[in-house]
Design a protein with these regions (language model features):
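Alpha/beta-hydrolase fold catalytic core
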Residues: 1-23, 44-47, 137-139, 246-247, ...
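Active-site loop/oxyanion-hole signature of alpha/beta-hydrolase fold enzymes
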Residues: 54-92, 263
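Conserved hydrolase catalytic core segment
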Residues: 87-130
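A catalytic-pocket lid/entrance helix-loop region that shapes and gates access to the active site
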Residues: 116-151
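Alpha/beta-hydrolase
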Residues: 147-237
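Conserved loop-alpha-helix segment in the C-terminal half of the alpha/beta-hydrolase fold
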Residues: 218-263
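Catalytic histidine-centered segment of alpha/beta-hydrolase-like enzymes
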Residues: 260-272
Length: 285
């Protein structure tokens, strides 16, 4: 599937498909719109997917702050207006993008909202714990790579090939995602993601649980939460464990909670089998 690129007030967007039904897709905290490449490739003919690079990421990296998830939600709503979203439009987000989707859906009606391994408030940090330290502990290698430079595109690809989440799950979609993220001169290549944008958004996620709770309760559209049973490093501890998700599923009658078997936080949007489940939920009647 080939993306057609455009800009909306400096935000890079990409469109795949030509169908009348619309999906708007939002990526994670250090990612880019190319994290939706596997979804775009399998898109049914009656659908169009619009993905966007969030402020401070991808080809939207040059947009200024302030950052924070409410700012990203405003950008999503601006893109929705630009592409002609209507009451039949589906909104989805992966990881941090799921939280952005919640904030956007609290302000505008969508046909449904599909949250992919994100969207539920994290427990408050213990007293004295610095949000930046909590973010670093949670993201691990994903944050480390933003501080590094790479001698070649192949070296950056190799970094991702060695990531435990992609062991045995490498694909053309993953490689295209990785190469899209690179910028800078040969010999000193780096990720396009702006470290301060990532830190600012991470602080917001770890300190604004009340705002997320209010937004979740304000969403009128039916919501589907798709959870990966394994985490960012393919470990047994998921991003959203059962004891976090169950109370929210009970609290919000419009929320359907589902675990997608045999995937981790990354492969839930890259692995063909996992993507088939995701697409089924996105395009359900």
């Amino acid at each position: 599937m080939t993306f057609a690129f455009d800009d909306v007030d400096g935000l890079r967007i990409a469109r795949a498909g030509t169908g009348p039904r619309l999906i708007i897709a939002v990526h994670g905290i250090t990612a880019s719109l190319m994290s939706w490449g596997a979804v775009a490739r399998r898109l049914p003919g009656e659908w169009t997917l619009v993905a966007m690079d969030l402020r401070g990421r991808g080809h939207s990296a040059g947009l200024p702050g302030p950052y924070g998830l409410p700012r990203h939600a405003e950008d999503v709503l601006r893109v929705a207006e630009h592409v002609g979203a209507d009451g039949g439009t589906v909104l989805t987000g992966h990881s941090m993008g799921a939280y952005v989707a919640v904030l956007a859906a609290a302000r505008r009606d969508f046909a449904r909202v599909v949250l992919v391994d994100g969207g539920l408030p994290f427990p408050p940090l213990p007293e004295g714990v610095d949000p930046d330290a909590a973010l670093a502990a949670a993201l691990g290698p994903a944050l480390d790579r933003l501080r590094q430079t790479y001698p070649s595109a192949e070296a950056y690809v190799e970094f991702f090939r060695n990531h435990p989440a992609f062991a045995g799950h490498w694909s053309d979609d993953v490689e295209e995602y990785v190469r899209y993220d690179l910028t800078g001169p040969e010999g000193a290549l780096r990720s396009r993601a702006v470290p301060e944008a990532v830190r600012a958004d991470g602080r917001w996620l770890h300190t604004e649980q009340a705002a997320l709770t209010t937004a979740l309760e304000a969403v009128k559209a039916p919501m589907t939460l798709l959870r990966a049973p394994r985490g960012l490093l393919n470990q047994d501890v998921p991003m959203l464990p059962d004891d976090l998700a169950a109370p929210w599923a009970a609290r919000l009658p419009g929320l359907r909670d589902e675990v997608v078997p045999d995937c981790n936080h990354y492969t839930i949007v890259f692995d063909d089998r996992c993507v088939a489940t995701l697409l089924d939920r996105l395009t359900a009647p």
